[in-house]
Regions:
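A residue-level signal for conserved active-site and pocket-lining positions in enzyme catalytic cores
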Residues: 38-39, 154, 237
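Short connector loops/turns at beta-strand edges and beta->alpha or beta->beta junctions
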Residues: 68, 165-169, 212-216
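Conserved catalytic cores of phosphodiester-cleaving nucleases, focusing on short active-site segments
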Residues: 150-176, 190
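Metal-dependent nuclease catalytic regions and adjoining charged, substrate-binding loops involved
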Residues: 189-281
Length: 281
């Protein structure tokens, strides 16, 4: 198995979680599916219209002869039908065909709005030029010898760009998400992987993150990682790889707390440090 960031990041919670996710892959969530649609619309606009379609309300009629207003879930000959018995023609399927992705109408509208915002954002448009999107890279980690792989959102000859869709509406909130979600580790993983794979020079520019908000007015911000942030990401990656090697060698994948823990409540808790108990307690 070639190690990727989507797997390695689980070690930041516990080795047990990583092992569990390898053995029990998560089904795709609706937010993840929406994120993939946004990525396609922004990074592969020529493929988007032919790949992503939306569901509609059921095109059948009720017994009363009125249009069915249920959301369509079965597809036949360009039309959507609901799951009510008799509404979908024989031969209707859950998917329109191979290579076609389905999202609801609101999601498709949101996807297009996000893509338009990124295109209209001058710094982001400039970054997403002169390179190639959705690049698969493979490399052997120089320090550990582990075979690795990754899928880079956008790769230019001189720099790597990562795209994120977010509900955050301020720079401060998004920066907090970068730390909490380990995005700095992810971008460091891709950058150093691209360098080791010969896709970036050793003196490549620090990578960028383009963040597009999925909340109105679909604002866009482009960030370049500072050197300190990139180095923090690299340290995180090295720590996780070292832990992965240890667990693999031992065949032991412990949870968050394999040993007995002492529980100590914080100082602000009622009763701590002689504090009086509030009426609510």
């Amino acid at each position: 198995m070639k190690l990727n960031w989507s797997t390695l990041k689980f070690l930041a919670t516990s080795p047990k979680l990583l092992k569990w996710r390898v053995d029990h892959p998560e089904p795709e969530s609706i937010p993840l599916r929406l994120g993939r649609a946004i990525h396609c619309a922004i990074l592969e606009p020529d493929k988007f219209e032919g790949r992503w379609i939306s569901t509609t309300t059921c095109q059948a009629q009720t017994r009363a002869g009125e249009p069915c207003r249920a959301e369509g879930s079965r597809y036949f000959d360009g039309l959507w039908f609901c799951g009510v018995r008799g509404h979908a023609p024989p031969g209707a399927t859950n998917t329109p065909g191979e290579g076609i992705e389905v999202i609801d109408a609101e999601g498709l509208k949101l996807t297009r709005l996000c893509a338009e915002s990124v295109k209209a954002h001058a710094p982001s448009s400039k970054l997403l030029a002169g390179g190639h999107s959705e690049q698969e890279i493979e490399w052997v980690d120089a320090e550990s010898g582990i075979e690795c792989r990754g899928r880079v959102d956008y790769l230019r000859p001189d720099v790597l760009i990562d795209l994120k869709s977010t509900r955050r509406e301020t720079v401060r909130d998004f920066v907090g998400d970068v730390a909490r979600n380990l995005y700095h580790g992810q971008v460091a993983w891709y950058t150093d992987g691209a360098i080791q794979a010969g896709r970036l020079p050793a003196d490549a520019k620090n990578p960028y993150i383009i963040a597009v908000s999925t909340a109105e007015p679909y604002d866009v911000t482009a960030y370049q990682l500072s050197q300190a942030t990139l180095e923090a990401g690299r340290i995180l990656v090295r720590d996780l790889i070292a832990k992965y090697q240890e667990c693999t060698a031992a065949g032991y994948w412990p949870g968050i707390a394999p040993d007995m823990q002492t529980l100590e409540i914080p100082n602000w808790s009622p009763g701590m440090n002689g504090s009086e108990t509030d009426e609510r307690w």
